[in-house]
Amino acid sequence: AALDAGVRAIVCTPRAQNPTGVSLTAERAAQLRAVLAQHPYVLVIEDDHFSMLSREPYHSIIGPLHRRWALIRSVSKFLGPDMCLAVTASDPETAERLARRLSPGSTWVSHLLQRLVLALVSDDAVLAGVERAARHYRARNDRFAAELTRLGLPTAAGDGLSVWVRVPAPARAVAEQLMRRGWLARPGDEFVLADPAATHRLRLTVHDLSDTDLARLAADVAASARAIAPSPEASTAP
């Protein structure tokens, strides 16, 4: 509908979408490419921000004949926030338009920073560290999701730095309960313009937690949600 209405650009996160952690499957990417094939001049921007840390394959929605496109991969997720740089591949016209904006001044990208990033991503020891970090993030998310599921809150880990947790109560109220227990959680409606399902979601980041703290957080999420959620008896009472 948006394409038919004349939308000029689309931004897509193909992997580790924040906050949900979902990634495009090959089937879904193919479906979107087929739709976009009818609109080859709509600018398609893919923000593959998690790239080297992702545990999922990259599936693009940019078809081989699409005329306006850009694939962006930033490095700060795996090299740290000091490495404030992104690499872009695009069609020639989009590249030219971008180059005109990267003039000396606030949009200039330091050549020194570019060389430093190149040296880091070409270093085997650095790449091994990135791989260890990727495995760590996924393992911690998997463990937390399994713990929540064991406690009666079915959760899929997904990809990325956070876990998208469905709770059987308004997420804002659950987040307030968690704050009283010493945890800071982001309710799902902070990440959307209009999606009722997000009002029952929390975004939680757990990769820095010990096993003990991770289990305690999972227990606190479950307890907080159940303290607020209406009981089956109350919901079925006359």
For the regions a protein language model found, what residue spans apply to each?
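Active-site phosphate-binding strand-loop segment of PLP-dependent enzymes
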Residues: 1-54
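Residue-level detector of anion-binding/catalytic polar loops
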Residues: 43, 154, 184
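Conserved core segment of the aminotransferase class I/II
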Residues: 67-134
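Short hydrophobic/aromatic beta-strand micro-patches
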Residues: 89, 164-166, 205-207
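Conserved glycine-rich beta-strand-loop-beta hairpin in the small C-terminal domain of fold type I
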Residues: 134-145, 153-166
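PLP-dependent enzyme catalytic core of the Aspartate aminotransferase-like
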Residues: 180-181, 196-238
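Short, polar loop motifs at secondary-structure junctions
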Residues: 189-193
